Amino acid sequence: FNCLYLNPIFTAAEYHRYDLLDYYHVCPNLGTDDDFRELVSEVHNRGMHIIIDGVFNHSSWYFFAFDDVVKNGENSRYKDWFYGLKFPVKRPEDGESPSYTCFAYERKMPKLNTSNPEVRDYFMDVCRYWLEDFDVDGWRLDVANEVDKDFWRAFRSVAKKTKKDSVLIAEIWENSERWLQGDMFDSTMNYEFRKVCRDFFAFGKINAREFNSRFVDMLLRYPFPIVQGQLNLLDSHDVSRFRSLCAQNSADSGDSSAVDKRFRLAELCLLTSVGTPSVFYGDELGVVGFEECDYRAAMPWANPVKDNRDLFRELIKLRKSNDCFIHGNFRVLDYDERGKFVFARED
C-alpha cells in the first residue's frame, strides 16, 4: 500500500517538533485536531495509509512533567520520569551544563525514563489515543535504540490490540536484527541502503564489485520477509540531500547532467530493489542542501530546482506494474570494473 509518513505533528517548542510539549494535540502551526482528522479521512478515501512520528525517548523542557520537576524539585511527583536529575533542576542557559540527562547533549530535550511504569503507562495511552481516536495507521518511532526494550514490547502489544494492522517502524541506524524479532517492530529505517548507494552512485568511491558485495551483504543480513519490509531511503530529515551528494563527485566537474544521471540511477535502484521504498518530500522537485536549514526547507511548489516528477511517476508505475518488484527474489546478473551493475527481480 501507499503510505504518508509525517514527522512530528504534536505541539512542540522548536521548529522541528522533536521536543514535544503536548502529545495529545496537533501543533497549532499545522492546524487543528479536526484538520488532522480530515486529512486522515481523505488519505484513507484515496486508498492510502498514514503514520506519524512518535518521540518517546525525550521531551521538551517545557513538557508538563519536566516543568513540574523544575518548579518543585525533589518534591515533584514526576522526578522519576527523567534520567540523571541533580537538584535543584533548572533550565540552563546556552553553554551551561544541564543538571539532567539530555538527548544528544541538547539541553532543551531532557531524556525520559521509559523503564518507569508511570512513563510507560502515559505513552501507552498516547499510542492508543492516536490509533483509536484519529485512526492513524501506525508509528515511526524516533531514537528507538535508546528506549527501554520492555517499553517497546508493551507499545507493540497496545498498538496491535488497538489496531491489529498498525505498522511500527523504528529509527535504527545500524544493524537492526535484535529489534526485528517479532516482539517490538515491524520494520526499521534502512540507512545502510543509503550508505551503499551514496558510496557507489553519488561519490563513486567504490566500484561495482564492492557495491555488489555490500549490497548483497545488506540483503542477507535478515530473513527475506524482514528485508522486504525494510524502509529503504536515500533521503530523510536527518541527512544531507542525496542530490547534493551527487554534485560532490569530482569526476563530474560541475556537469549538471552527470549529477542528474547519478541521482536518477540511485532512485531507479531505490524503486526497484527489495524492500519498501521511501521518497522524502522535495526529491521530486530537486531540493538540495547539506545543512539542516536547507535539506529541511519548505517545499518549492512554484519554483522547483529540478522537476523530477515524471521520473518518479515512471518508476512508481514500473514498480506497481509487476508484483515481482514487491515480492520477488533479487538476483545479480552482472557487474564489472567500469561501473556496470545488473540485477533481476523475479518470481
Where are these regions (language model features)?
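Short, solvent-exposed turn/loop segments enriched in Gly/Ser/Thr/Pro and often Arg
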Residues: N2-E14, G54-F63, D142-D148, E171-S176, ...
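Hydrophobic faces of well-ordered beta-strands that scaffold small-molecule active sites
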Residues: L4-L6, I50-I52, W139, L168-A170, ...
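Conserved, mostly hydrophobic/aromatic
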Residues: L6, Y23, V43, D53, ...
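Active-site-proximal helices and loops of the catalytic beta/alpha 8
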Residues: V40-H44, H58, V70, E132, ...
